[in-house]
Amino acid sequence: MNGVSSRKVIYAALPRKLVAILTLAAISCVGAIIGGVGVASAQEVESNKMNEILNFRQYSPTFASAGQPTREQLQIIKDSGYERVIYIAFSTVGPAIPEEDQLVKALGMDYLHIPVDFNNPTIRDFNTFADAMQRESDRKTLLHCQVNARATAFSFLYRVIYQDVPVADAKRDMNSVWTPNQVWKDFIFSVLAANDKSPECEGCDWSVPEPR
């Protein structure tokens, strides 16, 4: 007796109600598989859209930094599961969105603004950011400024000081966006020193770019 005819005999011997239950279960399994593929595809699309934000960098499942997102990209940030947006530049310069706080809150995300002077960043600025991160360290957070210069520097410091990321790895991520100038090199070194951390690492070059 071949396999097909064997299956026919087995199903014929089963009660009709049981056959119906087995059929529904099989349909449900197929639906779940198809649904799972759909969810994965949607998440992948959202991730790709996040990469369209200026200089977007993802450090962990709950922490990323970027330059200034557009109004439309704020919705993408929300759809990608972010719960908090921290902005560390002035709201009156460049591509800043003056009403960003209102837009972010309207989308159901938390918003924190720490206006950091690019020409005079302070340890207090960084500590304000770090304190907020430490209070709710599990909240998925996007840190941003205008072009992700301030934000990558703050991200470098936070990851090295609070997440024990090797200096070389964190510096490589920062340098993929920019090389800090003398003001920011001095700032980074002072924050590291205040937290008993060294900027030195094998292969690290902290040379500053030539002034333009």
How does the language model describe each region?
Residues 2, 27, 31, 35-141, ...:
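Cys-dependent protein tyrosine phosphatase-like superfamily
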Residues 3-26, 35:
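Bacterial N-terminal signal peptides that target proteins for export
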